[in-house]
Amino acid sequence: MILVIAEKPSVAQTIAAVLGAKEKKDGFLTGSGYIVSWCVGHLVGLAEAAAYGEQYKKWSYDSLPILPQEWKYTVAADKEKQFKTLKELMHRTDVFEVVNACDAGREGELIFRFVYEMAGCKKPMRRLWISSMEDSAIKEGFSRLKNGEEYDALFASALCRAKADWLIGINATRLFSVLYNHTLNVGRVQTPTLKMLVDRDAAIATFKKEKYYHVRLTLSGAEAASERISDKAEADALKTTCEASKAVCTSLVKEKKTAAPPKLFDLTSLQREANRLFGYTAKQTLDLAQALYEKRLLTYPRTDSSYLTDDMGDTAAGIIKLLCGKFSFMAGKDFTPELGKVLNSKKVSDHHAIIPTMELAKSDLSALPEIERNILTLAGARLLMATAAPHTFEAVTAVFECAGQSFTARGKTILCEGWKEIDRRYRAALKNKPETDEVDSDTEKTLPPFTEGQTFENPAATVTEHDTTPPKPHNEASLLSAMERAGSEDTDPDAERKGLGTPATRAAVIEKLVKGGFVERKGKQLLPTKDGINLVCVLPDTLTSPQLTAEWENNLTQIAKGKADPAAFMEGIEDMARELVKTYPFLSDDKAQMFKPEREALGSCPRCGSPVYEGKKNYYCSNKECIFTMWKNDRFFEERKVTFTPKIAAALLKSGKVNVKKLYSPKTGKTYDGTIVLADTGGKYVNYRVELPKKK
């Protein structure tokens, strides 16, 4: 028997169907000489720091840095059953070979190898490496399985990445958490991502709005605008001069321009567009795409490619024909796809772009939940746009001179709507029309037929006032773009991963920052919290710059190619962890207080007016020179069996008295209702007295 191990149950089922393994068992499928099982993502991972000794169970500066000499692995607590199943299958006497069918990429290699090694498997290993889950691609992949040893360098690269993230993440998180007495999660990807939000927030906060003006001339019904003018008086003077002058057309340029169709979706671009059109978070979009994938209506979503493989032309053509019949917005549209634009096997690494599948033919779109239907339709519309004709237009720029200044008018004439017609139709069909973030260049009007040398006497002129605008806060769409581009100028063109994170992990990074209290959502906006801003301020540039990721990716790419030494890379990471701990042995008192939660004052001190706060045993004045203190265990309250709560303290500070029910009388042994009055005489101790309600 040949044991095939996929990354997820849904993928295993697809492979099993192709191989003829139809008999369902607990945790695997079998038949036709194959056993097909799955990993459920990361079954095995690097053990936590506490696994390396008692001294690491408690977070302390003295135990840092933590540098394991022999790495330990652990099975995820909620996945022990599936690991046991895989281990038993690997050790079955009738299994003579194991096929790694996990995702074709660095992380897929790591997921399989961790399980293979922890299970103690020594059987021959081969690798399935495919870019499509179409039946034909799976069959072809199994006909050309490669020896597992050919991917040893890729595994070494993946292992280095995992260990390096562990070393820097664990040591930096513990170091700064201990120093600041507050849990501060530090990570190679999430920390530079947080810095992007903090930098944008600072740019908005320091932005100073400035007014500027344009003088606009009306010429044969068209409008020509001056350059930006910062002084209102200067703009008014130019307007007056122009109205008494002559405008001359000094330049007329006509250019035929082309707007190429958008590329197919990879995960990040799908998340950006879904956020822009529907307001979905990156995680929501990933979850929806995954659900559609498991329903076999959408191809694998965790991809960084925007192309299809060369052998998918016929498949794509069939899907496009299906979409034209399924989508109401394509009704009456004669469409001939240009498939060559989207086929390029060289630009597909792990998985091809996200597109609908032929399963759509059997599916009723209206039966899907609306949010899933939105994602599926979006992916389908993008496939249609990507294979449509380019949008072509004639751009006209006319320059005029008047009163010694230049004025420009711009217009366009559409020659072929191309893909923008499909985009327009798709948007018109949306239930909720999205807000437009940018001014569409299609709104430029057609200019009248100007000629060079044409003159206009005493043109009508107006002055328009404008404000410079601050940068916009990041939303998920803009942050995903920034993460994708981050550090790319420092990254090797051949690096498998560029930017911060991967398409599959960026959503989780954003969610982790929100959950950790470093970022908050306000509508579509992502804003850093006070803790988030402080964290970026206290961390060294090494940890907040995307350059570290770029450097790592360059090295990891070389390791994957067998051109760099994994041991040397890890030695450098360990040195970095040592240096980090060595550089930050202690903090000043002021800095150590940065992450203390803001205290809420109970009221004002009756003696000096300073805020009064709750302590462990008392309520005290924050002015160190003032001795006003109300003790929680004051004998006055204990004798009357009253718990001196913050609510009572606040009332005493506000009005000097508080009504309390069921006061105990030591003399009578009974309870009564009364008013406790703050009878402060300014001495070392605060006094109180009880006033009884007046009898009517």
Residue spans of the language-model regions?
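Feature marking long nucleic-acid-engaging regions of large polymerase/nuclease enzymes
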Residues: E97-V98, F114-R127, R188, D199-A203, ...
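Intrinsically disordered, low-complexity regulatory segments
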Residues: M1-A162, W166, R427, P470
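Conserved short loop/turn motifs at secondary-structure junctions
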Residues: M1, A101-A104, N181-T183, K254-K263, ...
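Basic, low-complexity terminal or inter-domain segments flanking catalytic cores
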Residues: I2-L3, K25, K79, M90, ...
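C-terminal or mid-to-C-terminal helical accessory/interaction module adjacent to the motor/catalytic core
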Residues: D135-L217, K254-T258
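Metal- or metallocofactor-binding catalytic centers and their adjacent structured scaffolds
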Residues: A233-F265, Q271, Q547
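Amphipathic alpha-helical transducer elements in NTP-driven molecular machines
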Residues: P9-A16, G33-V36, V40, A76-K87, ...
